[in-house]
């Protein structure tokens, strides 16, 4: 997890953050440019404080405090993990070969949509990250617009974000590990579920807070509504991603944002009662009534 232990008392950890906009140039001449959504992303509750259920703070900090809220109340009322106001990097242009992706107009939304092969895009992204030589103590966020990934075939769509880690040689024979996020800012109406604006990025931010290296093992768990094991990783967003009302509204001035609801730590740990906010197993409290079942 990111930050200090809430059991050790109040402390504030602030993580330097970068946004790297990506413009995807498709073979039909259309460009979908994440640069156009940088301002909206920076103004969102991912970076700006709002009146959350655990205090006036950013989204990632709010859900982290909610996971350990009984401990926070007792031992660390001023415990926080915050993202810095992000440094915005120059836009990186990526030309998508016709065999690796395409752009079209959504039939319901009327929005321009790009679909890209996930293996190809992941390779491009890792090469870009390796070339930036970023401090491994920072969090780079690669931002696209209305561009989603498919696995092998466009019918196997859509990945709208992921977080991962990339190892590289460090000084003196050491090894650096850069964690990073890619997410796509999506227009209203593209998805039938409540996925728009920063939903994808909020999902990945919450998961990065809890499991930045994607190796934080927990007992295997099923997604709600299924008995099949889905994962044994602490992926707080994946646990709720099949709910139609997976996001909630946060008003920032006159603009509405839709960050995702997430599962809290006690759900994965099978704790009863939950040490989460108000004894909950999810941040908003309405989706998970009890700990994760065995599978």
Q: What is the meaning of each model-derived region?
A:
Residues 1-97:
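N-terminal carbohydrate-binding/catalytic regions of secreted carbohydrate-active enzymes
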Residues 35, 99-112:
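Long, folded non-catalytic interaction modules
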Residues 154-191, 195, 212-295:
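Metalloprotease/metallohydrolase-associated module, dominated by Zn2+-dependent proteases
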Residues 24, 45-48, 102, 160, ...:
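Short non-domain terminal segments
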Residues 22, 43-46, 55, 65, ...:
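A general marker of short, structured functional hotspots
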Residues 106-216:
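Active-site-proximal segment of zinc-dependent metalloprotease catalytic domains
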